[in-house]
């Protein structure tokens, strides 16, 4: 029985093997056809490449729309305008203003102070000057610029004066102002009961119209105002016409500020006197004031230089000097120097007065009154 079962099993197994052979070949061919490039190819053989058709999908090509170009009508050319000439305006020739008027120009840079040399011998002086000022051709009549002549006195016109005649007096004089420090200087004088003399310009460190209140206060408090020319010009380089114009222009500005009065005292910038200057000043009725004590505050306009200016003042007093040259345009002069000079004057038993007072000239003669 067992033998028969074994025989049947072997026979069935062989039959299955025989039946499976054609099925395996057909299955292999089907796999190859479905999966090209893979098994049963040898791993060292190159695999065939079968690109996929239409991959990636092609982009659709839509036809571009055709838009007709707009046809705008061309603008017609505008007619050319023919300019018409307007009649020229009638011009009136300018005339030089009189009285109060602003100066022609306002300086934007602080001018350089040119030192004034004061000799050491008395009473005569040898002035020095260096700046160059071109003479002006503007015609100005000779004689007294405006107003009536001053009252008769003993002080000569057109003569350089550099020494006081009244004993016990000292004249502190200030050139080139008014400026920012002139007002505080008046406060110092008021505190000490002293008077000063101011030789002013219209255009130098500042515009005199900007300091009209200071000028008016100076006049009201009894200080003396003198002319230092309109623009700080070197009068020795001008003719008589140019000299007269410099004096007249300043007088025309000062007069409305000080009740219509005009100074009769003057000081030439740089102490630049000449025969022409003296002759012209005699015709214009001006007293010419120099100095015989020079503090040289313009050379020592720093706190460290103030002791040098004080020493110069003391040496001038010991040499017999009485008219002192200072400048109210320097801050150190006003804030540090002047009080020391006033203290030295009091210490020596002297009085600080105006030039007119130290010459014995009445105050009525200091100005030319208005007509």
Swiss-Prot record:
Co(2+) binds at residues 176, 228, 232. GO terms for molecular function: chitin binding; chitin deacetylase activity; metal ion binding. Residues 168-353 form the NodB homology domain. Residues 79-89, 102-112 have a biased composition (Low complexity). PROSITE patterns: NODB. Disulfide bonds join 164-358. The active site is at residues 175, 327. It holds the Pfam family Polysacc_deac_1. The record marks 296 as: May prevent de-N-acetylated sugar residues from interacting with the active site. GO terms for biological process: chitin catabolic process; polysaccharide catabolic process. InterPro entries: Glyco_hydro/deAcase_b/a-brl, NODB_dom. Its cofactor is Co(2+). It catalyses: [(1->4)-N-acetyl-beta-D-glucosaminyl](n) + n H2O = chitosan + n acetate. Residues 1-20 form the signal peptide. Acetate binds at residues 175, 270. Its EC number is 3.5.1.41. PANTHER family: CHITIN DEACETYLASE (PTHR46471), CHITIN DEACETYLASE-RELATED (PTHR46471:SF2). Belongs to the polysaccharide deacetylase family. This is Chitin deacetylase. It comes from Arthroderma benhamiae (strain ATCC MYA-4681 / CBS 112371).
